Design a protein with these regions (language model features):
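TRNA-recognition modules of translation machinery and tRNA-sensing kinases, especially anticodon-binding
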Residues: 1-122
Length: 122
């Protein structure tokens, strides 16, 4: 009997694919920087109530939720980074001149996969 090492929808990224993906991400971020975009790295997880309020209903259902052992509050792992970037631009960077130009890249996690998009870790 074979035991799967990773949950459905997850995969290890091995050489040379991990290297190629890193180069592509770096090139995209460098191009954005050349056009005046600053890099932002939002947290992987945040309070579920705040994140769900900024996500569209369908995306909010994709969030993986868990209870934070420190605060005992429900946290959510982002299924999409765009809402977090909006939060950062509106709150933490509220003093910046408008428009705020931010670039971002990083992993997201979906609760469920679909037939057209079987990956859960993107």
């Amino acid at each position: 009997m074979t035991t799967a090492l990773l949950p459905t929808g997850f995969r290890d990224r091995l050489p040379p694919f991990a290297d190629a993906a890193a180069r592509l991400e770096a090139a995209a971020l460098a191009a954005a920087y050349a056009y005046g975009y600053e890099r932002a790295d939002p947290a992987l997880a945040e309070f579920e109530a705040g994140l769900a309020g900024r996500l569209k209903a369908a995306r909010a259902q994709d969030a993986v939720r868990f209870v934070d052992p420190v605060s005992q509050a429900t946290l959510a792992i982002r299924p999409d980074m765009t809402a977090q970037i909006g939060r950062i631009a509106a709150t933490r960077m509220g003093h910046h001149p408008r428009p705020v130009r931010l670039s971002y890249a990083g992993p997201v996690l979906k609760l469920r996969a679909s037939q057209l998009a079987p990956e859960r870790e993107l």
